UniProtKB/Swiss-Prot annotation:
It holds the Pfam family Prefoldin. Molecular chaperone capable of stabilizing a range of proteins. Seems to fulfill an ATP-independent, HSP70-like function in archaeal de novo protein folding. This is Prefoldin subunit alpha. Coiled coil: none annotated. The gene is pfdA.
Amino acid sequence: MSRQDVQRLLEEYQLIGELLSSLQAQHATVAELLEELTTALDGVRLLKGEGGERLVHIGAGLFVKGVFEAKEVLAPLGAGYHAFLDLNNAERILQERIEEYSKLKTSLEENIEKLAERAAQIRQALERLGIR
């Protein structure tokens, strides 16, 4: 293996490391969004349920106790806009977003796995050459 080949492997290894860091940060963000969406979906489903007193998560581990007669929720539409949605539409939209972000999370996991495998291959090749 020529010196240029070794240099290319080292550069590729460094680039893969940077890409992995970026993808892992994106994965963490998507996982947090999924958790938030799931919590919101649970809250909407609670509001759709029979009347009576209940605890509803309002974020940051906080819950509010009370009797809720809400038939609509204020939901973000994007670009700073919000709209009131009936509970069925809110539930549908949340489910769609959860599905979308779940697919993205799976895709990120697959890409992370592929890059990690390539990094391991390069690391092994470099170790065989006595480079660490």
